[in-house]
């Protein structure tokens, strides 16, 4: 019987898709009809409900109203349409927006409510939500429901939607160290994230290759660690702009400063921070991970992370902790002496000592933290509210077994392993990402409730501003729908039709999103 209900629901979804072909991600509940209403661009407006907690002056929604009016109709004037069918003349010139709780000057967080309802019928055109963040998601859905006839008339169908995200953390990671991404590329990415209902920008700011974050506490890190200290850095103003731009789109900024590995770019600007490597009994002239044996290391980290904690308002920081190469530590006699003094018998214990000390430092600043899975694998003692991000896809531990182990230990988990978008293969590889079920591991309902979402990751070894957009979009949309929509929304044919239309909508909005199959868009990219 359950299988029969699922089959019927998929048939219904396919039928509805004919009326809502560009809806992405698919809502939790939707009813839509052939009855349609005309939208008049010259007169259309967004308006606050008289009882809404948010009113004019709420910058989050005021700015969103301007954005979506421009996305829908542009800035030009439109002639009044003429009709042969009287049914088409019933117009909808106002979308009324009602919010229960005004959070207009706040930042979104992991607990933010994004539910909304959208009702379009003869009597009303109403978007209702508990928060401004839910209203933002509803505005995006509304914009996708509007369509234009061959004659140039805008319509919207009679529709009822009740929608909410399946997971609260739906992220995109950008790596701005291996290749510097201009500020405009980051802001453009935030725009398209909002179109896909992503709500976390995981900013992998620094790595071995470069240190583009401009630190006001340790300016030499940027001067000596960036590719170019004038053109290839993110100033304090740049960072503030990213954070505010994201906030206005309901997106959190999760900043990552990965240590003790992935820190070679830190060395030139912070003498004594990295471990000197030895070749036999002599210094080799090279450096390895952060030196965990010196008190000065922890003084430095304490000062730097105090700054970072003040710059980035989100409760969580990402502290990395992955891929620590022990070779240099093994070669260094001072490290060996420190380990002997501490009673450490292997280098995982040394790594754990460093990470545990860093976690304690960050905790003192009233921050939570996200770490890569190695921190859990190496049995570092962490707070119960730590979030573990799973990224390793290969054996010996398959990523679903890792999810099982992490949640069994009582920790919250994020999944990224199957969603590395920098890895490209010929053909519609978005389907592989779409088919991933984040809860497809053996575990109790309590374990599965600890999976709070996941992230699509775009690492930068072979990605810069020349190929970021087409490599990211619309492929990341597969992850967006998996993290937003119901676990029953899995039909590939249904997804293909909608994603094809959504890709064309992205192109219409000026996004150079790559095609997912043979075909065309009514408005091609060079025409935008």
From Swiss-Prot:
Residues 422-423 are annotated as: Critical for hydrolysis GM2 gangliosides. It catalyses: Hydrolysis of terminal non-reducing N-acetyl-D-hexosamine residues in N-acetyl-beta-D-hexosaminides; N-acetyl-beta-D-galactosaminyl-(1->4)-beta-D-3-sulfogalactosyl-(1->4)-beta-D-glucosyl-(1<->1')-ceramide + H2O = a beta-D-3-sulfogalactosyl-(1->4)-beta-D-glucosyl-(1<->1')-ceramide + N-acetyl-beta-D-galactosamine; a ganglioside GM2 (d18:1(4E)) + H2O = a ganglioside GM3 (d18:1(4E)) + N-acetyl-beta-D-galactosamine; a ganglioside GM2 + H2O = a ganglioside GM3 + N-acetyl-beta-D-galactosamine. Keywords: Disulfide bond, Glycoprotein, Glycosidase, Hydrolase, Lipid metabolism, Lysosome, Signal, Zymogen. InterPro entries: Beta_hexosaminidase_sua/sub, Glyco_hydro_20_cat, Glycoside_hydrolase_SF, Hex-like_dom2, HEX_eukaryotic_N. The active site is at 323 (proton donor). GO terms for molecular function: acetylglucosaminyltransferase activity; beta-N-acetylhexosaminidase activity; protein heterodimerization activity. SUPFAM superfamilies: (Trans)glycosidases (SSF51445), beta-N-acetylhexosaminidase-like domain (SSF55545). GO terms for cellular component: azurophil granule; beta-N-acetylhexosaminidase complex; cytosol; lysosomal lumen; lysosome; membrane. Glycans are attached at residues 115, 157, 295, 487. The keyword Transferase does not apply. It is an enzyme of class 3 (hydrolase). Its EC number is 3.2.1.52. Residues 1-22 form the signal peptide. Residues 23-88 form a propeptide. GO terms for biological process: adult walking behavior; carbohydrate metabolic process; cell morphogenesis involved in neuron differentiation; dermatan sulfate proteoglycan catabolic process; ganglioside catabolic process; glycosaminoglycan biosynthetic process; glycosaminoglycan metabolic process; hyaluronan catabolic process. Belongs to the glycosyl hydrolase 20 family. Hydrolyzes the non-reducing end N-acetyl-D-hexosamine and/or sulfated N-acetyl-D-hexosamine of glycoconjugates, such as the oligosaccharide moieties from proteins and neutral glycolipids, or from certain mucopolysaccharides. The isozyme S is as active as the isozyme A on the anionic bis-sulfated glycans, the chondroitin-6-sulfate trisaccharide (C6S-3), and the dermatan sulfate pentasaccharide, and the sulfated glycosphingolipid SM2. The isozyme B does not hydrolyze each of these substrates, however hydrolyzes efficiently neutral oligosaccharide. There are 3 beta-hexosaminidase isozymes: isozyme A (hexosaminidase A) is a heterodimer composed of one subunit alpha and one subunit beta (chain A and B); isozyme B (hexosaminidase B) is a homodimer of two beta subunits (two chains A and B); isozyme S (hexosaminidase S) is a homodimer of two alpha subunits. The composition of the dimer (isozyme A versus isozyme S) has a significant effect on the substrate specificity of the alpha subunit active site. This is Beta-hexosaminidase subunit alpha. The gene is Hexa.
